[in-house]
A protein has these predicted regions:
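TRNA-recognition modules of translation machinery and tRNA-sensing kinases, especially anticodon-binding
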Residues: 1-113
């Protein structure tokens, strides 16, 4: 029988590595909050236009490196390949430009192949 493997671009994280990552994440959060960054989290799934508008339709990331699919309503959805575009969408949607400057910190999975 074929051995099942994690999907390309993903991996399993064992307990020791997970604990180490959590410790680093706690330190990161403490430092960024100390220096006035706001912790934010954006969805792993975004409308593909979020990335096309900020990265460009012809960029290698869009053309070759994203996990993109259509949902049941035929909307094109992309797994987040990087963090800047979702932060820009977040910033605009929440009208945060009214209170500048803004500093954001974010951590999360990014998906490219």
């Amino acid at each position: 029988m074929k051995k099942l493997q994690p999907v390309r671009g993903t991996r399993d994280v064992l307990e020791e590595e997970f604990k180490d990552f959590q410790a680093h994440l706690m330190l990161w959060n403490t430092l960024t909050m100390h220096y006035g960054f706001n912790m934010v989290d954006t969805p792993i799934l975004e409308d593909s236009e979020v990335f096309k508008k900020t990265l460009g339709v012809t960029s290698d990331i869009i053309k070759k490196e994203t996990y993109t699919f259509k949902d049941r309503s035929n909307n094109e959805i992309t797994l987040r390949p990087e963090g800047t575009a979702p932060i820009i969408r977040f910033f605009i949607n929440n009208k945060l430009q009214k209170s500048l400057p803004q500093k954001f910190s974010y951590v999360g999975p990014m998906f490219r192949y």
